[in-house]
């Protein structure tokens, strides 16, 4: 072997190791810049010496010419589907069938439990360690040849990370698109006037079925393996879990949430844990897959029809359903935004009954081409507000009514205008409009603003309807006699409300700024403003140029803030609030350059008592930290509040520095 060949082999081996650390172990040993440097060095050497180019080189992920169509590949071992369970009773019946069928029943039965990824099932064949073929599941017997596209996925190794590869190994797994990548893809599409994707699964499917692999290479796809098909020239581990860990050891990525569970109760606990974590995973799942772990028991149980007897998919409640649009109401928000709200025939979606859904704005009504009486598709995912994502136009009845966007406010009859360039139409009534007054006051007392527990939306509606309050400052002028005259307001409830109002007078500057309801000023921006200007007077007196020096404050937001303080009514309300005793302590936060958290990955867990989770997150981000939702070997700090659970345990297991809330505050303040 020549020196050049040796150099090329060493570079390829090193790059494969770095790819394995990054994509499979989630624990890179070198910065991205070092990987990029070696990658470009390898690419340059291969250009100089094309005679030594190999198809499994890290540089050869993209290179195939666009296809005219996909050829068919017949699966040597069929890719079967799974039976489904939709309740604990159905899962327990599945376990009972297994127990009745097994001759020697182990106690307890051990299951390998996995999230059910919402992507596309694929088969990837390695011959002597090199990726040679990939196919979609298709109908389970025959799929489409997507080899060129699979090669472009960054976490799929082109060469297995082992010196003794099997003669033939078929890896089966799911290709999906994480939420962050999906959002970037759609953002790019919008900026370039291209068609957006409805959801990550559609995006993954469309990306895998591109005839041009160069397009697929630009899509943020990920593979997680869930099993093995063909295996020749290798003695595989005797349990499903150990097989997945073996795949991981040779460079194949598997899902980090996989868990072994003993007995049905532990399995159901896993199901509920994953269901609770669903919205924070960063990718779509639609249930769990539960498999008997012992391969010998799998073989004894065998198959029925087109599904194995030893596995089942326990699905989450449906996130999409069909229902009827009965009417549309137009609601007025605290900034005057007019939002059309669909009134639906009640339907059970993702564990709750849905009867309302947002239609966002007039553009959305036009885009959906929706009418009253239509059959619509409702989607509810995690904590997301239910929304209409489609209309079955072929079912439109003859008596369907068009949705007419109002020209005057449905509450105060003021004119509705839509500023050019904005999607939202707004009522021009301002605080003359009772709806805007109510929503502004609800925002003021909300948990992330002034956090006034004893004063809720129903109470505010009564107070506004009876014209007992007009501004936030009026809340602090309420007395026991006034409150006890209201409906459903006894002496005890009235006292609680007054105590909450008194306690709320002591707040923080960022909470106070957020509570004022300045358009475009969210929690993070309010925190940045408070930390930049330090005092309310400095913020009030700031000009446009000074405002734009604050992180995340651009021209539009600066204008909103500047105009707010030029309105005499707003200044009068703020002065009245301070006159009523609203106050805060000045806390100076260290600059990013001199704090412990700059360029570090931080995880928050438990209940923080001195500030909200969102406040702490925004503060850490301002200090230059990356705030993550899960603990891994890349985590630098875990900030643990009261009741910290599994994240704290994992941090201790990985020897990650854990700070209490008090230690965190001591680090960030002068």
Swiss-Prot record:
Keyword set, alphabetical order: DNA damage, DNA repair, DNA replication, Ligase, Magnesium, Manganese, Metal-binding, NAD, Zinc
Record's catalysed reaction(s): NAD(+) + (deoxyribonucleotide)n-3'-hydroxyl + 5'-phospho-(deoxyribonucleotide)m = (deoxyribonucleotide)n+m + AMP + beta-nicotinamide D-nucleotide
Binding site for NAD(+): 32-36, 81-82, 114, 137, 174, 291, 315
Family matches, as Pfam families: BRCT, DNA_ligase_aden, DNA_ligase_OB, DNA_ligase_ZBD, HHH_2, HHH_5, Nlig-Ia
S-adenosyl-L-methionine listed as a keyword: no
Gene Ontology molecular function terms on file: DNA binding; DNA ligase (NAD+) activity; metal ion binding
Enzyme Commission number, as recorded: 6.5.1.2
Entry keyword annotation includes DNA damage: yes
Enzyme class: ligase
CC cofactor: Mg(2+); Mn(2+)
Recorded GO CC terms: cytosol
Domain of life: Bacteria
InterPro entries listed in its UniProt record: BRCT_dom (IPR001357), BRCT_dom_sf (IPR036420), DisA/LigA_HHH (IPR041663), DNA_ligase (IPR001679), DNA_ligase_AS (IPR018239), DNA_ligase_CS (IPR033136), DNAligase_adenylation (IPR013839), DNAligase_N (IPR013840)
GO biological process, one term: DNA replication
Record-annotated BRCT domain positions: 592-670
Active site, UniProt feature: 116
Binding site for Zn(2+): 409, 412, 427, 433
Function, as annotated: DNA ligase that catalyzes the formation of phosphodiester linkages between 5'-phosphoryl and 3'-hydroxyl groups in double-stranded DNA using NAD as a coenzyme and as the energy source for the reaction. It is essential for DNA replication and repair of damaged DNA.
Family according to the record: Belongs to the NAD-dependent DNA ligase family. LigA subfamily.
NCBIfam families xref list: dnlj, PRK07956.1
Protein name according to UniProt: DNA ligase
Native organism: Haemophilus influenzae (strain 86-028NP)
Record gene name: ligA
């Amino acid at each position: 072997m020549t020196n050049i060949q040796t150099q090329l082999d060493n570079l390829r081996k090193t790059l494969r190791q770095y790819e394995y650390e990054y994509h499979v172990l989630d624990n890179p040993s070198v910065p991205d810049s070092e990987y990029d440097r070696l990658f470009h060095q390898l690419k340059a050497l291969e250009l100089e010496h094309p005679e030594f180019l190999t198809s499994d080189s890290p540089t050869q992920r993209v290179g195939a010419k666009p296809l005219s169509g996909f050829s068919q590949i017949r699966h040597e071992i069929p890719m079967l589907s799974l039976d489904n369970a939709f309740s604990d009773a159905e899962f327990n019946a599945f376990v009972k069938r297994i127990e009745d069928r097994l001759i020697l029943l182990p106690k307890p039965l051990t299951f390998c439990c996995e999230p059910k990824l919402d992507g596309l099932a694929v088969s990837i064949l390695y011959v002597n360690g090199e990726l040679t073929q990939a196919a979609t599941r298709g109908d389970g017997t025959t799929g489409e040849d997507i080899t060129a596209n699979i090669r472009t996925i960054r976490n799929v190794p082109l060469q297995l990370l082992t010196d003794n590869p099997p003669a033939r190994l078929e890896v089966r797994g799911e290709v999906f698109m994480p939420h962050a990548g999906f959002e970037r893809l759609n953002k790019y599409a919008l900026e370039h006037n291209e068609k957006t994707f409805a959801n990550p699964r559609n995006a993954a499917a469309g990306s895998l079925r591109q005839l041009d692999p160069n397009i697929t290479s630009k899509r943020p796809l990920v593979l997680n393996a869930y099993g093995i098909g063909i295996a020749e020239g290798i003695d595989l581990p005797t349990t499903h879990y150990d097989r997945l860990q073996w795949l991981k050891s040779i460079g194949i990525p598997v899902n980090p949430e996989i868990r072994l569970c003993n007995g049905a109760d532990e399995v159901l606990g896993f199901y509920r844990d994953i269901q609770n974590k669903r919205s924070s995973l960063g990718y779509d799942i639609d249930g769990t897959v539960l498999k008997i772990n012992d391969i010998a028991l799998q073989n004894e149980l065998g198959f029925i029809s087109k599904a194995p007897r030893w596995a089942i998919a326990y699905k989450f409640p449906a996130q999409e359903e069909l229902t009827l649009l009965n009417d549309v109401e137009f609601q007025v928000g605290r900034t005057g935004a007019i939002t059309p709200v669909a009134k639906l025939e009640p339907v059970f979606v993702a564990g709750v009954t849905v009867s309302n859904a947002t239609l966002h704005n007039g553009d959305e009504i036009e885009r959906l081409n929706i009418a009253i009486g239509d059959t619509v598709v409702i989607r509810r995912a995690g904590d997301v507000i239910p929304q209409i994502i489609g209309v079955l136009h072929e079912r439109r009845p003859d008596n369907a009514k068009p949705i007419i966007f109002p020209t005057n406010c449905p509450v105060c009859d003021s004119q509705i205008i839509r500023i050019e360039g904005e999607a939202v139409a707004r009522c021009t009534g301002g605080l003359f409009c009772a709806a805007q007054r109510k929503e502004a006051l609800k925002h003021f007392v909300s948990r992330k603003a002034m956090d006034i527990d004893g004063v809720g939306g129903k109470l505010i509606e009564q107070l506004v309807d009876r014209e007992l309050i007009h501004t936030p400052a009026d809340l602090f002028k309420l007395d026991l006699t006034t409150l006890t005259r209201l409906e459903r307001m006894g002496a005890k409830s009235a006292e609680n409300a007054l105590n909450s109002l008194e306690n709320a007078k002591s707040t923080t500057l960022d909470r106070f700024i957020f509570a004022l309801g300045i358009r475009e000023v969210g929690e993070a921006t309010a925190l940045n403003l408070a930390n930049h200007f330090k005092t309310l007077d400095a913020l009030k007196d700031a000009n446009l140029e000074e405002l734009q020096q604050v992180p995340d404050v651009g021209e539009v937001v600066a204008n909103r803030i500047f105009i707010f303080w030029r309105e005499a009514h707003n200044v009068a309300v703020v002065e009245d609030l301070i006159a009523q005793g609203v106050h805060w302590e000045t806390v100076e936060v260290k600059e990013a350059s001199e704090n412990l958290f700059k360029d570090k990955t931080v995880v928050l867990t438990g209940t923080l008592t001195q500030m909200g989770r969102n406040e702490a997150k925004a503060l850490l981000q301002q200090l230059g930290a990356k705030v993550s939702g899960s603990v891994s070997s890349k985590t630098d700090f875990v900030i643990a509040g009261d009741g910290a659970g599994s994240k704290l345990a994992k941090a201790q297991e990985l020897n990650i520095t854990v700070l209490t809330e008090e230690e965190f505050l001591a680090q960030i303040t002068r």
